[in-house]
């Protein structure tokens, strides 16, 4: 009997206030002709079975930037309280049937579908039982991949559920994923980050 393919979903956090880029929503900034959030969502769609986008700040504009993509949308009315609330909203909306879930940031423009597929493959080959945290040259990155059984434990924590707290409290359930590039530790928070990314002539996601 052929083994069932390993099935991963992504929770894409796109609700934040872009506090470090005053006056602009960084997710709507165009990179290579498309909004940053759309570029990132397409990467996860290419590598994952399903993608759940958590909306909050300027949610209507972010949703509009994603028009036409086969995504599931989740609203986080408490987005101003910070990222943990978006994580809670995202994992609460997940359907059954996944083996693992990526908690992903929408501002990582350097990531490619190949990067994400490699992380998912490492989880599958390792038996899918541990949280995988990407590192590059000693620096901790994103996305973090959670086995679905541990997502259930996070849900049970209610308002106390937070990725970093859960990881730090359960080191025995966590493994490092040594990334081959800096894509996992590169994000766009400031105009300086954007300029550095554009100067680096990053390839389009593939």
Where are these regions (language model features)?
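Short, structured coil segments at secondary-structure junctions
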Residues: 24, 47, 67-70, 170
């Amino acid at each position: 009997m052929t083994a069932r393919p390993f099935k991963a979903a992504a929770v894409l956090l796109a609700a934040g206030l872009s506090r470090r880029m005053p006056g602009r929503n960084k997710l709507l900034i165009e990179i290579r002709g498309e909004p940053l959030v759309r570029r990132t969502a397409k990467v996860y769609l290419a590598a994952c079975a399903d993608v759940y986008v958590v909306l909050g700040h300027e949610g209507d504009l972010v949703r509009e930037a994603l028009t036409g993509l086969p995504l599931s949308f989740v609203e986080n009315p408490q987005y101003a309280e910070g990222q943990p609330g978006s994580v809670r909203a995202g994992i609460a909306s997940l359907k059954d049937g996944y083996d693992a879930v990526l908690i992903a940031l929408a501002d990582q423009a350097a990531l490619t579908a190949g990067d994400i597929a490699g992380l998912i493959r490492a989880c599958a080959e390792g038996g899918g039982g541990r949280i995988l945290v990407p590192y590059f040259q000693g620096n901790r990155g994103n996305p973090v991949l959670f086995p679905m059984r541990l997502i259930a434990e996070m849900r049970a924590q209610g308002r106390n559920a937070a990725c970093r707290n859960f990881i730090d409290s359960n080191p025995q359930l966590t493994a490092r994923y040594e990334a081959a590039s800096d894509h996992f530790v590169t994000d766009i928070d400031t105009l300086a980050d954007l300029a550095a990314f554009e100067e680096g002539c990053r390839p389009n996601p593939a």
